Amino acid sequence: MYRKSALELRDAVVNRELSVTAITEYFYHRIESHDEQIGAFLSLCKERALLRASRIDDKLAKGDPIGLLAGIPIGVKDNIHITGVKTTCASKMLENFVAPFDSTVVRRIEMEDGILLGKLNMDEFAMGSTTRYSAFHPTNNPWDLERVPGGSSGGSAAAVSARFCPIALGSDTGGSIRQPAAFCGVVGFKPSYGAVSRYGLVAFGSSLDQIGPLTTVVEDVALAMDAFAGRDPKDSTTRDFFKGTFSQALSLEVPKLIGVPRGFLDGLQEDCKENFFEALAVMEREGSRIIDVDLSVLKHAVPVYYIVASAEAATNLARFDGVRYGHRCAQADNMHEMYARSRKEGFGKEVTRRILLGNYVLSAERQNIFYKKGMAVRARLIDAFQAAFERCDVIAMPVCATPAIRDQDVLDPVSLYLQDVYTVAVNLAYLPAISVPSGLSKEGLPLGVQFIGERGSDQQICQVGYSFQEHSQIKQLYPKAVNGLFDGGIE
């Protein structure tokens, strides 16, 4: 059953080949048998999920119509609210916080009869790229348990890679869906800013965050987006970008002009560079034309991103003070000491580091030097992408400079920040991007290529990703590090 895509599972439900209860029980058995080694989940909603599965089976038995996601098990990153379920953001600060309402994406998934399995591990408050910054436990890469799965949506990527669920929700602030997707050999889609509601997502960077799906195949990205994309009155940043469905769009003619910023590829590990150019060759054989585009301004993307993201994080996380929300210290002599102790005890080192950086760049003495200049460069970066899209339909870039790194190779914070060089610009410019598996490194680790489009061209980007998937002959990648999970290799 784990070899079936979400779309295939739904077809099996519709055709009465499988019951929703049987599917749900099967995937819980996989999680309970193997997740101890991987650590993808923080909590499970088993009783809730099986009750919903039974109700959907009853609907089928009565001949009632069922939703788009009927019978599909879905994991949810633990910064997205499900009513009555803990939302910890993988932080001691929110260790006991129970969500009082559903996020819009969760509400729409359940309206379409999706089955929510549980909450997935992440870097604390989505700040990190290894899932080693979780306050509770690390998540391991199913391809090599001594390597990181990426982050911050590392639990989501690992869960899909291990086939604990065919779809997982992640959030992408600077690459947090696409980078772990590439590290774990799955598909990751970062929608345009405003394409998916952020209502019920715990905010990190409010002008950067987007919720998106991680899946095994591009068709399931389209299915998920059809279920939960679109305007939401509870999120004023959402827009109606799309005509028709994502699933229908996959069969339309693929854009043929692909831009590549070749001057921005020098930092790639050699086998990653070879793999990227092999991916371009696949698209050329399919009929695309590859041209060079000038995106030299991208060299400023990482520092600008960490200025903007840290400033927004410092503002958003100010609410976690031990009074209104979050952990409160056991003893303090006065209110100011209570604030300080509660935040010191509740936040981990990486979150603290970014709050300090954000407060620094927003301080009266430094705001003009850092934050305002950073926003000016962000505007230049947006202009550079717009100029590039006047010459091409889609931009292709690597996702990561290297395959997944080992625990002992986890770098100092600044070096880890520089790993985001190929992903953060997409968020700064509000663009959609999809990461699709592109093969294996010389060490047998998965690699990914990303396709980037203009804001609102999400369906077109999925078309390109689907075309690459079909022509690359890499339909699904199966990891082999966990005994009994599956055989390993490419299918």
Curated annotation (Swiss-Prot):
Signal peptide: none annotated. GO terms for biological process: translation. Disulfide bonds: none annotated. It catalyses: L-glutamyl-tRNA(Gln) + L-glutamine + ATP + H2O = L-glutaminyl-tRNA(Gln) + L-glutamate + ADP + phosphate + H(+). InterPro entries: Amidase, Amidase_CS, Amidase_dom, AS_sf, GatA. Gene3D superfamilies: Amidase signature (AS) domain. The active site is at 77 (charge relay system), 152 (charge relay system), 176 (acyl-ester intermediate). The keyword RNA-binding does not apply. Its EC number is 6.3.5.7. Pfam families: Amidase. One of its GO terms (molecular function) is ATP binding. Keywords: ATP-binding, Ligase, Nucleotide-binding, Protein biosynthesis. GO terms for cellular component: glutamyl-tRNA(Gln) amidotransferase complex. Belongs to the amidase family. GatA subfamily. Heterotrimer of A, B and C subunits. This is Glutamyl-tRNA(Gln) amidotransferase subunit A.
